[in-house]
From Swiss-Prot:
Statement: the UniProt record of this protein carries the keyword Disulfide bond: yes
Family: Belongs to the peptidase S1 family.
Site (Required for specificity): 204
SMART domains per record: Tryp_SPc (SM00020)
Protein name: Hypodermin-B
Domain Peptidase S1: 31-254
Gene Ontology CC annotation, any one: extracellular region
Pfam families, per database record: Trypsin
Organism: Hypoderma lineatum
Keywords: Disulfide bond, Hydrolase, Protease, Secreted, Serine protease, Signal, Zymogen
Length: 256
């Protein structure tokens, strides 16, 4: 059964995407099967907030630019957004910054979730340190079965009514586009050319971790996008492949 748990009003207000086969974007914030984490281990991770609540994740690309998912920013105004950086907790620590503008990929399609990527421009520049740091963009798609880690904030069990405030992370394995659309898994042709998957039994990013980082080594390889339920057997998490949209990110980060 498809899952979409509305935990706070801000989540309900921002939701607007329709994904392949009725599957839903990961908007309510949970890392399933993971562990509590410290921001010093994920200094590129940010919490994107609206109305005082976390609803999506993101990654620091430069002192002014945050990479996130396009579906996080549908039907929303930049003035409503806040970004917390440098904190292990989405409701405290670090700095809470305003957003001056954002840009959604021109080819983003909410019906099929292709090009699910966007950029936020902060109103003030970040100062890098132990808890605030950018992450490099992957230049190529990682190989099948590569070790990866995904991080974010949110509930730790499906249908769990509370959203923990501390950052969490989970180790997963990369599933290539070809394998993810094969009979081994349940998505078929819903996996498009701008997507990559990651999977581990009982482990996953889920709704609300949207826009957050999938990392291999020291590179951002994916942006949390969509999936079937939370850690459902046979259904990997689906991410925007950063190597595919890398040139769009670098070019647009300079121009707005």
């Amino acid at each position: 059964m498809l899952k979409f748990v509305i935990l706070v009003c801000s989540v309900a207000c921002v939701f607007g995407a329709v994904v392949p086969g009725g599957m839903l974007p990961q908007l309510d914030g949970r890392i399933v099967g993971g562990f509590e984490a410290d921001i010093e281990d994920f200094p590129w991770q940010v919490s994107i907030q609206r109305g005082g609540y976390h609803f999506c994740g993101g990654s620091i690309y430069s002192p002014e630019i945050i990479v996130t998912a396009a579906h996080c920013l549908e039907k929303i105004d930049a003035s409503q957004l806040r970004v917390r950086v440098g904190g292990s907790y989405w409701d405290e620590e670090g700095s809470l910054l305003t957003v001056s503008n954002f840009k959604i990929h021109e080819k983003y399609d909410a019906m099929i979730m292709w090009y699910d990527v966007a950029l936020l421009k902060l109103s003030s520049k970040l100062t890098y340190g132990a808890t605030v740091k950018n992450i490099e963009l992957a230049k190529e798609t990682p190989p099948d079965n590569a070790d990866a880690v995904v991080s974010g904030w949110g509930t730790i069990y499906e249908n769990y009514p509370y959203m923990p405030v501390q950052l969490r992370s989970v180790d997963v394995k990369i599933v290539s586009r070809e394998v993810c659309r094969s009979d081994e898994y349940g998505y078929g042709n819903a996996i498009g050319p701008t997507m990559i998957c990651a999977y581990a039994v009982g482990k996953d990013a889920c709704q609300g971790d949207s826009g957050g980082p999938l990392v291999v080594g020291e590179a951002l390889v994916g942006v949390v996008s969509w999936g079937e339920g939370c850690a459902y057997p046979g259904f990997p998490g689906v991410y925007t492949d950063v190597s595919v949209v890398r040139s769009w990110i670098t070019e647009n980060a300079k121009s707005f």
